[in-house]
Every structure is written in structure tokens, then in C-alpha cells.
Curated annotation (Swiss-Prot):
Molecular function GO labels: peptidase activity; serine-type endopeptidase activity
Protein name: Dipeptidyl-peptidase 5
Gene source species: Aspergillus fumigatus (strain ATCC MYA-4609 / CBS 101355 / FGSC A1100 / Af293)
Record PTM: N-glycosylated.
Pfam families the UniProt entry points to: PD40 (PF07676), Peptidase_S9 (PF00326)
Sorted UniProt keywords: Glycoprotein, Hydrolase, Protease, Secreted, Serine protease, Signal
Length: 721
């Protein structure tokens, strides 16, 4: 490593260019920056896809926290995770195993001589989410998660016996979830110990891994598809493990209820929930989803979040602090705060908590006393962008990693009493693909909506000139309880759309998160009501107040609930205001909602089951005959085969109707994608077709010689007409 030089963050800078789909997809993607104990450097990973080689490469680097310069730590793409053991010592996961196909290895090395490390453990399957704690004797206790058989044995896909039949048989739901079919294997947290050797002898695995989850029937942690290392924690002394699992006694498809379990690291006892129905400290009436368990520095307390409602995935998260061994009711902390935080860390002295929460179109950091009363209002100390990870430095400041609408990676320091202290690195100052992007690319406004003021982002194109006019792109977010935030996305990136020659307006209508729970909750049984009214009022505001926006040649696009709303708009007066529409994975036929996997979602959104409240389901039906008769705007329909949340039949049904009605339309399908399109090659086609579609009908294709065209896609179009 000594041959590598520290590189200036501006070393790769080049001339500003519009953000093309190719640049968006191939721009380096960096992980959170994890500081070493001294606070001098931080380690992070980078991956980058190439359309020349059609491969992704990855490497690890060190970031100098004083100068902002970086240098490569290792180019070994098999290094999947890194944990600091000391200022120079590192424990890392090698994603391959020389002795066990499908297994992984743990290696110990020095940051100053990375290639000279040694193997400390050979693990029998694929594991990730490594967390460690050093004991007084110098041993390293660790936890990680992998797949498990019902008997607790780690599941290794490469060594598993392939069944002779492809049949699947189910006696209960779930049958499938997100993009996979459920089987008898499940996620589980495993514990192990690396024993410190004597003298010059290094660490080695002491005994076998222990499954901490499988002894609890029907438990699973982390919970797929989005669960990960934040679903469990290891106490600083290595004695205890806390993990989240959905309620084993309840039907998983009908309830969001989950508990936080506590178990000794050595698995000497079976895990027990601290907030289950029979737990002595369970707060009265609190039955919703639990999340993000985090031990205090001395290990005697455990912070976590929990929702109240047992069927509402977007209920407000409330912070709780449990005292280990206590049978008293677990107290809430700042329980009346009208925000829904989703990450938490203790300050080193154990007196204060730092939480991350959506707030007014950002993800901000807040501080609050660990014993704050319910009426306490946490104090924000970051502003723009979306903070995604944060670690304490020796001087009690925080090293924060985040993003913004104008950069996919932003590292800075902040402190509760001082706010943002120092910017260390930002991708738009490093990467040629993002060069020229900056805060001036965006603005925001509020307008009077259906019942309250509504927020909207404005994203400008390259070389924006307010004396000119640019066609409108109307972005509608999914969820429906979600938002457009000041954060980077490689799937729906408004800057990449704007740089075709548009102004993007991205409103946060009724149902949006981060603006108070009342706005979020108001979309229940109201999908085509207040949110649609908000969008109409937003369009009117833009038409009347933003002189640089050409609403006569505008287009609209949305995914998931945003796709539903595009389908709803197609049959509404607002649909006639647009030259083209793009609907990605949206619901179309009201009665088809019963085909989803997370039944709690639809049953909560529409106030009952499909058979008890069918009128509610049909109230906002884009496929109602009277609405279909209004369809007229050219429409691109995108739907993929592995989308089990909103099955592909929804998109096919919509396309059938559009074709039968003679509306210009196209169907884009990916057999290997789910609710999202993430494969780089597929993502490129997705962008070419979505942007090409709107460019064709808005007139941008003719006015901008560099605009994306439908003809850019090399995949042949099937057209029997």
C-alpha cells in the first residue's frame, strides 16, 4: 500500500457535463465512511460499473479526515466488509473461502500493510453484517447473519442438495415476498469468538458459530428484503445480543408487529422479547413494528424504535430505552415528537442520543437526552441533504456520510452544539461523471394544497437560464407514504431527467413522510382524493408562478403509488395537461390488489379486507369504465416479472386497455427485475425508454440534439402491427 499516493478530492475533476443515464449509472458508488479509533482516517468501499467491460469493479480506500485526500487500501474485490480493531488493525470479511465453496473467511491485517494479513476463521456459509466487541482478555466476540436451516445449521447454497422437483407447496401465507418465494430456510444471526493467541500467535476461531435466532420458533432476523445489520446489535462488552424479529405467533402477511429479542452472546439461554405480549415491560397498547436496537456504551441500556399500530408500516416510530434486567414499563423518549426517526446512536458518555429522521424533505440528525420526557423536542444540527450514517470521533464530533440531490456521496463533520463543522469530501468534486453538479441545481417552494401547505422540489437543467422556458416533468413519488427528499437516487434521479432539457417539479403531496404524521396518515382510504387535489394545485401553481416552466409541453412520471397516480391521472382532467405519461409498477385494477403479498398494507389503506370493504378498494379504481373512456395521453407502461408487491398482470392489464383504446403506448418488461430496476444494463434501457418516450412527445427530442431517443436502445421492439 505504501506505493499508493494520497489523491486530492479534485484530482479527477473535468469539464461540467449534463448528467446522462450512462454517467448516472457508471458514477462511482461509495459506502459510508467508517473512522478508525484515532479519528485520523476513515475506510470506505467504492464500486463502479463499466459499459465497456460490462463488469463491476470494487475496491477499498482510506480517507484522510484532515485533508480530505484518499488512497487505495486494497483492490481485492473479495473484501466485502471491514471492521476496525485498533488505529491500524483491521478485521475483514473475505467473500470467498479457499476450503469451503460458498463459505467466507475472516482475516486480520494492518491498514499500513494490508496484503500481509492472515486468516483467522473459515466460516461454513455466506455471512455478512459483521459486528465486533473486544473483551477484557483481548478476545473478539462477533455476530453476523446468514441463512439457516430450521435445525439451526447454516445454509450454504453452493453445498445444498438440489431438489429433483421444482414444486412449491404452501399451507400458509406468505407464499412469496418482494421478489422471492419463501422456503424453509430463513435469516438468522450467528455468534462466534476469535480467541487471542499467546505471544505472536494471532486470532483464531474458538469453537463453532452459534445460531441465536433458530431456537425461537418462526423467528427471523434480519427480516428480508430490506433488513440488515441495523436489525441487531452486540453489546460493547460482547455479552449480549439484541435482534429484531417479526412476531412469531402472528401471520406475517397480516401484521407488521415485531419484537426486540435479547440473548446471551454464547447462546446459553434462548432469546426472549423485551417488548412482546408477555414481557413485563411492554408499553401498553404498543403493538407495531420494532426496529434498530442499539446498546448504550456500558451495555446496561438498549435504545430502539417501535410503532403503535400492528398493521401500519408507516406509523410514527417512537424511541424507547430499555434498562437490561428491568421489569418496569419501558419508557418512551420524546414520545410526542411529530417525526418518525429511523436510526439512533448513543454519545460516548451514554447521556445523549443522536437520531436520524426525515424532516421537511431531508434526512437530518437530531440530539436529545437519553431520559428526555415525552414533550421534549429534539434539536436538529444538520440541514440540507440526507444523512445516512454517522460515527463519533474522539473529539465528540460526528463523522457523517450522506448525499443530496446534487451529489451521491458527501462526508462532513458535525456536532450537536455547533452544527456542520467541516466538509471533508463530496463526489461532485471528485468524479468526472458528477462534475458541475451543486446546490444551485435545486430549489423548493410551498403551495396551498387540499388542506395544508404542501412542499415541492424544483430541479433545473444544465446551464439553466430563467429567462427561457423548459418543458415540465411532473414527478410523483411512491409509498404512498414516502417522499421526494434531498438525497441521491440511481433509480429515479430528477437531475438526470432535468438534464434532458426540462425543469423537474417533485411535490410531496398528502401521504408524504417527514412533514408531520397527520399529512402521512391523511392518505388512508383517500388515494385518489386529497393527493390528486394536491397535484392539481401544484400544477396550477407552477403554471401561474414559474415563468420558466412550459406546462403546455409537460410530461408526468411515477412509480409504485406514483404509478397508480399516473394511471389515475390518465383518466382525469389533469391527464390532458400532459403530452406523455410514464407509469412504472403501478396498480391499475382495484380488485387485483388482493394479489399483493403484504396484505396488511392494502387492508389498512382501505379500511378492511377485500370482501368486507370492497367499495373502498373500488372507490379509487383507475380501471373503472368511465375512467378508461377518458384515456388519451401517450403512455409508457413499465412492469417487471419479479415484482410480487404489484404483480406484472397489473401492467399487462393497463397496456391491454391502452392498446384496445388506441392510445399510443408501449410496454417495457424485465423478466429478472422486481419492483425496482437495478441491473446496470437494464437500468440503461429503462432510462433510454423512459426518457426517450417523454422526449418524443414533449418536443425535446427535436430541440435537443443530445437528448436520449427511443432508438438508442438496441433491444428489438416487438410490433406485429
Amino acid at each position: 500500500m505504501g506505493a499508493f499516493r494520497w489523491l486530492s478530492i479534485a484530482a479527477a475533476a473535468s469539464t461540467a457535463l449534463a448528467l446522462t443515464p450512462e454517467q448516472l449509472i457508471t458514477a462511482p458508488r461509495r459506502s459510508e465512511a467508517i473512522p478508525d479509533p484515532s479519528g485520523k482516517v476513515a475506510v470506505f468501499s467504492t464500486s463502479q460499473y463499466s459499459f465497456e467491460t460490462h463488469k463491476r469493479t470494487s475496491w477499498w480506500s482510506l480517507l484522510d479526515l484532515k485533508t480530505g485526500q484518499t488512497k487505495v487500501l486494497t483492490n481485492d474485490s473479495s473484501v466485502s466488509e471491514i471492521v476496525w480493531l485498533s488505529d491500524d488493525s483491521i478485521l475483514y470479511v473475505n467473500s470467498t473461502n479457499a476450503d469451503i465453496p460458498g463459505g467466507v473467511e475472516l482475516w486480520v491485517t494492518q491498514a499500513s500493510s494490508f496484503a500481509k494479513g492472515y486468516k483467522a476463521a473459515s466460516l461454513p456459509a455466506s455471512f455478512s453484517g459483521l459486528k465486533t466487541a473486544k473483551t477484557k482478555s483481548g478476545d473478539i466476540r462477533f455476530v453476523a447473519y446468514g441463512q439457516s436451516y430450521p435445525n439451526g445449521t447454516a445454509y450454504n447454497e453452493e453445498l445444498a442438495t438440489a431438489p429433483l422437483s421444482s414444486a412449491r407447496i404452501y399451507d400458509s401465507i406468505y407464499v412469496r415476498h418482494w421478489d422471492y418465494w419463501l422456503s424453509t430456510t430463513f435469516n438468522a444471526v450467528f455468534s462466534g469468538t476469535l480467541k487471542k493467541g499467546h505471544g505472536k500467535n494471532g486470532y483464531s476461531l474458538d469453537g463453532e458459530l452459534k445460531n441465536l435466532v433458530s431456537p425461537v420458533k418462526n423467528a427471523e432476523s434480519p427480516y428480508p428484503p430490506f433488513g440488515g445489520a441495523s436489525d441487531y446489535d452486540l453489546s460493547p462488552d460482547g455479552k449480549w445480543v439484541a435482534f429484531k424479529s417479526k412476531a412469531p405467533e402472528l401471520p406475517k402477511a397480516n401484521f407488521t408487529t415485531s419484537y426486540i429479542y435479547l440473548v446471551p452472546h454464547d447462546a446459553s439461554e434462548t432469546a426472549r422479547p423485551i417488548n412482546g405480549p408477555d414481557s413485563p415491560g411492554t408499553p401498553k397498547g404498543i403493538k407495531g413494528d420494532s426496529s434498530s436496537p442499539v446498546f448504550s456504551p456500558n451495555g446496561d441500556k438498549l435504545a430502539y424504535f417501535q410503532m403503535r399500530d400492528e398493521t401500519y408500516e408507516s406509523d410514527r416510530r417512537v424511541l424507547y430505552v430499555y434498562s437490561l434486567g428491568s421489569k418496569k414499563t419501558i419508557p418512551s423518549v420524546a414520545g410526542d415528537w411529530d417525526r418518525s426517526p429511523d436510526s439512533v446512536k448513543w454519545t460516548p458518555d451514554g447521556k445523549t442520543l443522536i437520531v436520524g429522521s426525515e424532516d421537511l424533505g431531508r434526512t437530518r440528525l437530531f440530539s436529545l437526552p437519553a431520559n428526555a420526557k415525552d414533550d421534549y423536542k429534539p434539536k436538529n444540527f444538520t440541514d440540507g441533504g440526507s444523512a445516512s450514517a454517522y460515527y463519533f470521533l474522539p473529539d465528540s464530533s460526528l463523522l457523517v456520510t450522506g448525499s443530496a440531490l446534487w451529489t451521491n456521496w458527501n462526508v462532513y463533520t458535525a456536532k450537536p452544539e455547533k452544527g456542520v463543522i467541516k466538509k471533508i469530501a463530496s463526489a461532485n468534486e471528485i468524479d468526472p461523471e458528477l462534475k458541475g453538479l451543486g446546490p444551485s441545481d435545486i430549489s423548493e417552494f410551498y403551495f396551498q394544497g387540499n388542506f395544508t401547505d404542501i412542499h415541492a422540489w424544483v430541479i433545473y437543467p444544465e446551464n439553466f437560464d430563467k429567462s427561457k422556458k423548459y418543458p415540465l416533468i411532473f414527478f410523483i413519488h411512491g409509498g404512498p407514504q414516502g417522499n421526494w427528499a434531498d438525497g441521491w437516487s440511481t433509480r429515479w434521479n430528477p437531475k438526470a431527467w432535468a438534464d434532458q432539457g426540462y425543469v423537474v417539479v417533485a411535490p410531496n403531496p398528502t401521504g408524504s413522510t417527514g412533514f408531520g404524521q397527520a399529512l402521512t396518515d391523511a392518505i388512508q382510504n383517500n388515494w385518489g382524493g386529497a393527493p390528486y387535489d394536491d397535484l392539481v394545485k401544484c400544477w396550477e401553481y407552477v403554471h401561474e408562478n414559474l415563468d420558466y416552466v412550459d406546462t403546455d409541453h409537460g410530461v408526468a412520471a411515477g412509480a409504485s403509488y406514483g404509478g397508480f397516480m399516473i394511471n389515475w391521472i390518465q383518466g382525469s382532467p389533469l391527464g390532458r395537461k400532459f403530452k406523455a405519461l410514464v407509469s412504472h409498477d403501478g396498480t391499475f385494477v382495484a380488485d387485483a390488489k388482493v394479489s399483493t403479498e403484504e396484505l396488511w398494507f392494502m387492508q389498512r389503506e382501505f379500511n378492511g379486507t377485500f370482501w368486507d370493504a370492497r367499495d373502498n378498494y373500488r372507490r379509487w379504481d383507475p380501471s373503472a369504465p368511465e375512467r378508461i373512456l377518458q384515456f388519451a395521453t401517450p403512455m409508457l407502461v413499465i412492469h417487471s416479472d419479479k415484482d410480487y408487491r404489484l404483480p406484472v398482470a397489473e401492467g399487462l392489464s393497463l397496456f391491454n386497455v391502452l392498446q384496445e383504446r388506441g392510445v399510443p403506448s408501449r410496454f417495457l418488461n424485465f423478466p429478472d427485475e422486481n419492483h425496482w430496476v437495478v441491473n446496470p444494463e437494464n437500468s440503461l434501457v429503462w432510462h433510454q425508454q423512459a426518457l426517450g418516450w417523454i422526449n418524443k412527445y414533449s418536443g425535446v427530442e427535436k430541440s435537443n440534439p443530445n437528448a436520449v431517443s427511443l432508438e438508442d436502445t438496441v433491444v428489438p421492439v416487438v410490433n406485429y402491427n
